[in-house]
Amino acid sequence: MEALIVSGGHLDEEFAVSHMRQYSFDMTIAVDSGMGFFYRQNRMPHYIVGDFDSVKPEILESFRNRTETDASESFQELQLQSTESADFEKQPEQRQKKPVILQFQPEKDETDTEIAIRTAISQGCDTIHILGATGTRVDHMMGNIHLLGMAMEQGVSCLLLDKYNRIRMINRGLVLKKEEQYGNYVSLLPFTPQVTGLTLTGFKYPLNDYTMECYHSLGVSNEITAEQAEISFQDGVLLVVESRD
């Protein structure tokens, strides 16, 4: 089950529309000012989450007026909700008439994007694409990158995407097909003190049983040269960034 989260960071709307057409998402979630994208595109998300401190009041009100159930609840209640009890009914987005609104207090321990990811996972999603999670606020972007680890530890594939980058976090091997690559460059950044036994095949700069350490730039800007490239390692966590100019 695949989810699309549109967060409140910088969003290239032409790219976002194209991405939605490329994939068939079972669930869409608008995060705070990210609901502006759905509003302008005349689309209805399944969920709207956040403290709503950055969205225009008239946009929020337009969705509230089309909502039967304003399901405001605490983050703790959301966290405890099981997939079995959620009873989320999949339906085509064009038939989705009324979103579920989850509103939270501005003073909280989790960002709105974290709440959105937890919402998707609680509904049984095993793949999550996040748009609008990069931009001018480096602290928010770094926080969103860290959230990839939360999803990874629960066995959920989570991607941050914008027009130029596709970012994921892995704790096991990965195969990248050249025909499906996101851009010309693949960067590998250790997210643990060491990534041991790292072997890269099908890349311009291969490695064999290498120990890659944090705080070095060795893994930046590699390139796929074969029909497919393989990343394997024994232990650690890697951030994989596919980029294009």
Language model feature labels by segment:
Residues 1-62:
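N-terminal beta-strand-loop-alpha-helix module at the start
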Residues 61-98:
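Intrinsically disordered, low-complexity terminal tails and inter-domain linkers enriched
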Residues 87, 99-122:
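Short phosphate-binding loop-to-helix
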Residues 135, 139-149:
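Short Gly/Thr/Asp-enriched flexible loops that form oxyanion-binding sites at enzyme active sites
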Residues 150-166:
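Short, acidic/small-residue loops that bind anionic groups at enzyme active sites
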Residues 165, 170-245:
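Long, charged alpha-helical interface segments
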